[in-house]
Swiss-Prot record:
GO biological process, one term: amino acid biosynthetic process
Highest taxon above the source species: Bacteria
Subcellular localization: Cytoplasm
EC number in record: 2.7.1.71
The protein's role, per its UniProt record: Catalyzes the specific phosphorylation of the 3-hydroxyl group of shikimic acid using ATP as a cosubstrate.
Family: Belongs to the shikimate kinase family.
Binding-site positions, substrate: 28, 52, 75, 134
Pathway this chain belongs to: Metabolic intermediate biosynthesis; chorismate biosynthesis; chorismate from D-erythrose 4-phosphate and phosphoenolpyruvate: step 5/7
Cofactor binding: number and manner: Binds 1 Mg(2+) ion per subunit.
Gene encoding the protein: aroK
Molecular functions (GO terms): ATP binding; magnesium ion binding; shikimate kinase activity
Positions that bind Mg(2+): 14
Protein name in the entry: Shikimate kinase
CDD domains per record: SK (cd00464)
C-alpha cells in the first residue's frame, strides 16, 4: 500500500523523503514538471483554484498507482474535499509530520529559496489561524503522527520505514 506524507508547509516532508530507502514521489516536483513552471509562478499567474485542480488530479493518479511508494504531498493537499476523501481511502497509511507553529514560522520566514505564496500573503497572526485550520484536516486524516521538532530527518525516516 502506498504511504502518504502529510504536513504543513515547511515541516520537512521533502527533506525527510530524501532519507527514505523507499521510492518517493514528490507531488510538488511532479506538478512543476507538468505545468512547466514553479508552483509560486503558477499561483501568481493562474490562482489557487487552478493549482488545486491540478494537485487533485496528480494525487488521484499517484494513489491509484498503489506501488508501495511514498507520496510526498504539498502542504495544501488537504484543502479540497475530494482530496480528503481520496486520503481517507488510504486509511492506515497516512503519516503526518508535525512541528510547532513557531518552528514552522521561523523555517518559512528564513526560507528565501521557496517563497511560498500562501506564507507571504498573511501576517503572523493570520498565518497562525491558517495553520490551525489546516491542522484539523491533517489530524483527521492521519494514522501515524510524528513530532519532528527535536528529531533529525534521518530519525523521522526510520520511524516511517518501521511503520
Amino acid at each position: 500500500m502506498t504511504k502518504v506524507l502529510l504536513g504543513f508547509m515547511g515541516v520537512g516532508k521533502t527533506t525527510v523523503s530524501k532519507h527514505l530507502s523507499m521510492h518517493c514521489k514528490d507531488m510538488d516536483a511532479i506538478i512543476e514538471a507538468k505545468i512547466g513552471m514553479s508552483i509560486a509562478a503558477f499561483f501568481e499567474q493562474h490562482g489557487e483554484i487552478a493549482f488545486r485542480t491540478i494537485e487533485s488530479q496528480v494525487l488521484k493518479d499517484l494513489l491509484f498507482t498503489n506501488d508501495n511508494s511514498v507520496i510526498v504531498t504539498g502542504g495544501g493537499v488537504v484543502v479540497l474535499q475530494e482530496n480528503r476523501q481520496l486520503l481517507r481511502k488510504n486509511h492506515q497509511h497516512n503519516i503526518l509530520l508535525v512541528a510547532s507553529f513557531e518552528t514552522l514560522y521561523q523555517r518559512l520566514k528564513h526560507d528565501k529559496k521557496s517563497q511560498r505564496p500562501l506564507f507571504l500573503k498573511y501576517s503572523k497572526e493570520a498565518f497562525y489561524e491558517f495553520y490551525q485550520q489546516r491542522m484539523v484536516f491533517y489530524e483527521g486524516l492521519s494514522d501515524l503522527v510524528i513530532r519532528v521538532d527535536h528529531r533529525t530527518p534521518e530519525e523521522v525516516a526510520n520511524i516511517i520505514e518501521g511503520y
